[in-house]
Amino acid sequence: MHQRILILDYGSQVTQLIARRVREAGVYSEIHAGDVDDAFVRDQVAQGLKGIILSGSHASAYEEGSMRVPAAVFEVGVPVLGICYGMQSMAQQLGGTVSFSDHREFGYAEVRAHGHTKLLDGLADFTTDEGHGMLKVWMSHGDKVTELPPGFKLMASTASCPIAGMADEDRGFYAVQFHPEVTHTVQGKAMLARFVKDICGCEGDWNMPDYISEAVARIREQVGSDEVILGLSGGVDSLVAAALIHRAIGDQLTCVFVDHGLLRLDEGKQVMQTFAENMGVKIVHVDATSQFMGKLTGVADPEAKRKIIGREFVEVFQDEAGKLQGAKWLAQGTIYPDVIESAGAKTGKATSIKSHHNVGGLPDTLNLQLLEPLRELFKDEVRELGVALGLPPQMVYRHPFPGPGLGVRILGEVKHEYAELLRRADAIFIEELRNAKDPASGLTWYELTSQAFAVFLPVKSVGVMGDGRTYEYVVALRAVQTFDFMTADWAPLPHPLLARVSSRIINEVRGINRVVYDVSSKPPATIEWE
């Protein structure tokens, strides 16, 4: 059994990032609801648990009905790290004081480390003129600790949060008000690695080859001799899911590629060629363009569009499954960011942002059980898994594409005309990103961006072409850089590149006369517009 860290989830949107950072340190981690009982915690320790991390939350630590940390967490003798709400709960339950703050902190902050603790000693992003080591971190809190519990010492502070970190090193208890799990906290990865390795004593015995072996064994045990049907979207997630399942059960898997009329330019042909040449998997191509477009007519609300697309996918799969003798499982390439944004995480505590067409809630009429082998993985882990499975890098590192396709990149009602314009504009954008190199890194801008696409805006603007007046549509370009897709920054594309893309779209795509560039980060914006 792997050495492991238990993460107790209190509802933060980024709880799974904690698990990701722990795994990057080569240590296996599991997430469980924060309200597990004492017996569960003691049983975990009896099985060799090395440490516990308490997540953040959107709730208040002193709000009536807020979850409390199981008392056993502080009694079983393993190191504990509290993050944000986890820090406040630790302080409150161990005799400190938590108060509502008039100065709420959301975003970038600079933290001063104190006391030379094992967690923060020697970590600094810059040094002040007075010689104090400072950390660049990400804050997201309203409440704050105003009095340390007995036995604790000050570990960190900010200008507006005098107690931004605390530690009782005799018991191995550490807590920080900021979020070390997000990439905006520059030393966060090092902090978490230091906690699980130096403080908890984990050696780092978890890796992708082990994960593949364990996942293959789980799939075989779960599926047995049953037939499995998997829906291909053309994206990385369903591709890797197909490769993993195929390794586990071979010809028991049949892939169904549904063309809903909302794919990228020539994507249907590319998917069929790619899967036939590289995977040797049974694949069925279904052209359901008329079915999907008909159902979307007159629908403008993004949630309604997603749900319609999800429902139609289910209907198509049900039809195809009925043609397969023995098909009892529907496999999907659902990954964790899909789950967390739908508040479908297994702990069920996160706040919903948007629904995803391939998350939870399959109707009973489908009569298929759900197989989601990538449900606990982030996008970067999925890519790592794909390479380890032997898939071509050019397939694995393709930019992600949402299951609803262009349906959520056309704002408002989806029309065939809009889809055709967007397809061509998007293809030009991606082509130029692939052709343009950054001289500093030698990489193309397609490689330097994590996701890039065009968005169709159903509004018209006045323009001039030749000697004539035009009144045509607008497209927005979106390009982001991110490590885990839970947070993202807009990509600083060179102005000459943006100018070239704009010129080509306006001149080559009749019906578009204005191009704009989206400079919003996540948060507060999501990566997709809908």
From Swiss-Prot:
ATP binds at residues 233-239. Transmembrane segments: none annotated. Pathway: Purine metabolism; GMP biosynthesis; GMP from XMP (L-Gln route): step 1/1. The keyword Ligase applies. It catalyses: XMP + L-glutamine + ATP + H2O = GMP + L-glutamate + AMP + diphosphate + 2 H(+). NCBIfam families: guaA_Cterm, guaA_Nterm, PRK00074.1. Catalyzes the synthesis of GMP from XMP. This is GMP synthase [glutamine-hydrolyzing]. It comes from Bordetella parapertussis (strain 12822 / ATCC BAA-587 / NCTC 13253). The gene is guaA.
